[in-house]
Amino acid sequence: MQVILMETVEALGLAGTEVKVAPGYARNFLFPRQKAMAATPANRRRMEQMRAKIELQIAKERGAAQEAAKKLEGVVCRISAKVSNEGRLYGSVTVGDIVEALAARDITVSKKMVLLRENIKEVGTYPVGIYLYKDVVPEISVEIVADEKAE
């Protein structure tokens, strides 16, 4: 089913674009939440009239994301965890741990925004991406330090 996105949907595309989706996804998710409308000739004309407004909204969102990226760039987040004598963690550092550590520094991000490339199971420094907008993904450093040595 062809639909026109009325707002940016992360998995599909930017507002104002026409995409093909499963009919059930359109009927049960996109249409009730007013995130998309059916791609009829009348709706295409309506979207052309709204295109300038949508482009302005996209520019604002991208600008806000780029400002936030400047603040996040170069941030080092330190997390202490219990480790063994070999430097391996008991368990692992999760996305939730990273979100909590950033919240302690007055940086608000959701778990969905944190892009963890690998499981963190050892002491060290790891690069972690923070998804802010489609092409705005600043990297922070997460440093895992030993809390106390286990016997």
Swiss-Prot record:
GO cellular component: ribonucleoprotein complex; ribosome
A biological-process GO annotation: translation
Gene Ontology molecular function: any one: rRNA binding
Gene3D superfamilies registered for this protein in UniProt: Ribosomal protein L9, C-terminal domain, Ribosomal protein L9, N-terminal domain
Keyword Ribosomal protein: yes
InterPro entries in alphabetical order: Ribosomal_bL9, Ribosomal_bL9/RNase_H1_N, Ribosomal_bL9_bac/chp, Ribosomal_bL9_C, Ribosomal_bL9_C_sf, Ribosomal_bL9_N, Ribosomal_bL9_N_sf
Entry keyword set: Ribonucleoprotein, Ribosomal protein, RNA-binding, rRNA-binding
Its job: Binds to the 23S rRNA.
Family from the record: Belongs to the bacterial ribosomal protein bL9 family.
Name used for this protein in its record: Large ribosomal subunit protein bL9
Native organism taxonomy: Bacteria, Pseudomonadati, Thermodesulfobacteriota, Desulfobacteria, Desulfobacterales
